[in-house]
């Protein structure tokens, strides 16, 4: 319970895309990004290096690459708009940078959903020293 309280307090100080990304993951993949993907494999969570360990970790690798292509705003804090139409997430708004961040998050959430069968608990809190291989290019 204490951990949940700490997480809640930390989230209060975070605005924009990271909170929205969590909400998209919950809406699309029906899982908590925080408790399922924040420390998974070599790429899910802060930073990322080495080779993705499985298809789920590869979703995070692609998401990191997508964020790396965002240049006109900070993808971790840019607040964007989206809607749901016929069961699909549609990114909106007039700001192309924020829309790009939304697309990165949308694609990752769909990837997580589509790869739920590949999720392997052995990659949760995967030791970083196991992520030393040369990464593939974005």
From Swiss-Prot:
InterPro entries found in the cross-reference section: PLipase_A2 (IPR001211), PLipase_A2_Asp_AS (IPR033112), PLipase_A2_dom (IPR016090), PLipase_A2_dom_sf (IPR036444), PLipase_A2_His_AS (IPR033113)
Reactions accelerated catalytically: a 1,2-diacyl-sn-glycero-3-phosphocholine + H2O = a 1-acyl-sn-glycero-3-phosphocholine + a fatty acid + H(+)
Residues that, per the record, bind Ca(2+): 43, 45, 47, 64
SMART domains found in the cross-reference section: PA2c
GO molecular function: calcium ion binding; calcium-dependent phospholipase A2 activity; phospholipid binding; toxin activity
Thermal dependence of activity, per record: Optimum temperature is 37.3 degrees Celsius.
Entry's EC annotation: 3.1.1.4
Record keywords: Calcium, Disulfide bond, Hemostasis impairing toxin, Hydrolase, Lipid degradation, Lipid metabolism, Metal-binding, Myotoxin, Platelet aggregation inhibiting toxin, Secreted, Signal, Toxin
Claim: Calcium is one of the keywords in the record: yes
Main subcellular localisation: secreted
Cofactor section: Ca(2+)
Signal peptide bounds: 1-16
Top-level taxon: Eukaryota
pH dependence: Optimum pH is 7.9.
Active site: 63, 105
GO biological process per UniProt: arachidonate secretion; lipid catabolic process; negative regulation of T cell proliferation; phospholipid metabolic process
Subcellular location: Secreted
Subunit architecture: Homodimer.
Family as reported in the entry's similarity comment: Belongs to the phospholipase A2 family. Group II subfamily. D49 sub-subfamily.
Protein name: Acidic phospholipase A2 CoaPLA2
Organism, scientific name: Crotalus lutosus abyssus (Grand Canyon rattlesnake)
């Amino acid at each position: 319970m204490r951990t949940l309280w700490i997480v809640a307090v930390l989230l209060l100080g975070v605005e924009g895309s990271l909170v929205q990304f969590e909400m998209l993951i919950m809406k699309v993949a029906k899982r908590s990004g925080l408790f399922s993907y924040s420390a998974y494999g070599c790429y899910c969570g802060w930073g990322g290096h080495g080779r993705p360990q499985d298809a789920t970790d590869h979703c995070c690798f692609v998401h990191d690459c997508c964020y790396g292509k965002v240049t006109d705003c900070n993808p971790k804090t840019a607040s964007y708009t989206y809607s749901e139409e016929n069961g699909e997430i549609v990114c909106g708004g007039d700001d192309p940078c924020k829309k790009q961040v939304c697309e990165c998050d949308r694609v990752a959430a769909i990837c997580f959903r589509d790869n739920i069968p590949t999720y392997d608990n052995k990659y949760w809190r995967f030791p970083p020293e196991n992520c030393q291989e040369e990464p593939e290019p974005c």
